C-alpha cells in the first residue's frame, strides 16, 4: 500500500470544511490515515461553487503557493472532491456524502465511511515510476 504525502478534500464552503477537518482529525487520531500524512481541506474560492475543474485548479494553486513545481516534485497527492449539498441524502448533509458510513470496520474495529474505502482503494494503486 502506498501512502500519500498530502491528502486534500475539497469543500463547498467554510462550514462544510470545518466538518471535514473534524472527520480527518478523528481519522488521524484513530489510525485510519497514516502518520505523517499532511491533510488539508480547501474550500471553493469566494464561497462560490466552481465545479470539479475549478476546485482542482484552486487546489493546485494553493499547494504551489509560490513554490511552483517544487511543491509537487516527488510527492503523492490525493485530491478528493467532496463538496456538495447531499440533496438526495439529507441525513448525511452535515458530514458530507464522502463521510457516509458503510457497513464495515477498519483493522482495529473502527467504523468506516465511504472516504475510508476510497483512500484504501487508491492507496493500493501503484505509484508512478
Please give the residue ranges for each predicted region:
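Unchanged
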Residues: 1-129
Amino acid at each position: 500500500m502506498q501512502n500519500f504525502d498530502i491528502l486534500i478534500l475539497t469543500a463547498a464552503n467554510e462550514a462544510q470544511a470545518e466538518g471535514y477537518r473534524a472527520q480527518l482529525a478523528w481519522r488521524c487520531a484513530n489510525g485510519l490515515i497514516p502518520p505523517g500524512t499532511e491533510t488539508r481541506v480547501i474550500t471553493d474560492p469566494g464561497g462560490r461553487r466552481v465545479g470539479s475543474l475549478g476546485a482542482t485548479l484552486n487546489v493546485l494553486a494553493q499547494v504551489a503557493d509560490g513554490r511552483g513545481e517544487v511543491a509537487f516534485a516527488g510527492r503523492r497527492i490525493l485530491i478528493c472532491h467532496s463538496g456538495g449539498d447531499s440533496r438526495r441524502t439529507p441525513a448525511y448533509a452535515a458530514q458530507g456524502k464522502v463521510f457516509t458510513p458503510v457497513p464495515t470496520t477498519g483493522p482495529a474495529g473502527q467504523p468506516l465511511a465511504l472516504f475510508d474505502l476510497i483512500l484504501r482503494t487508491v492507496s493500493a494503486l501503484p505509484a508512478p515510476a
